[in-house]
């Protein structure tokens, strides 16, 4: 988490909630899977579909990782979560990033997916601010994740 921000996810309900503060260089929270025990080959899939509730119109990031280096490149897509909705995240549209900074020269290894992550951050990409970010409490219920 960033600075004094904190969050938790309830594995039974999929409710991810917490409090975001900009104190102590904060302004973001995240939740991620543990690295998968063997990479997923998603080469027959076009992307990931997320079904959610309670997003309150906030702008979140969905991250797919093809490396266990959690300080390395990740594949990121931003989405606005209405109260109830579905978002399709095509692999072809994901942005390679390292800590919200875009990078070039990398290719997503669709046959080597090792983790998934959600983030809520005051930053979009390359220092640009998230237009739907507020400090304070947030809630996102992740109802379903599936490949399509």
Which functions belong to the PLM regions below?
Residues 1-148:
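Beta-rich carbohydrate-recognition modules and glycan-binding surfaces
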């Amino acid at each position: 988490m960033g600075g004094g921000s904190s969050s938790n996810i309830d594995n039974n309900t999929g409710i991810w909630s917490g409090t975001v503060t900009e104190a102590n260089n904060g302004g973001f929270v995240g939740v991620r899977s543990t690295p998968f025990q063997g990479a997923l080959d998603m080469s027959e899939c076009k992307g990931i579909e997320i079904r959610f509730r309670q997003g309150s119109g906030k702008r979140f990031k969905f991250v797919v990782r093809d490396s266990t280096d959690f300080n390395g490149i990740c594949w990121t897509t931003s989405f606005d979560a209405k109260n109830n909705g579905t978002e399709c995240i095509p692999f072809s549209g994901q942005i390679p990033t390292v800590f919200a900074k875009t990078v070039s020269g990398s290719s997503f290894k669709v046959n080597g997916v090792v983790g998934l992550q959600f983030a809520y951050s005051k930053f979009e990409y390359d220092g640009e601010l998230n237009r739907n970010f507020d400090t304070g409490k947030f809630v996102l219920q992740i109802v379903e994740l599936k490949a399509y």
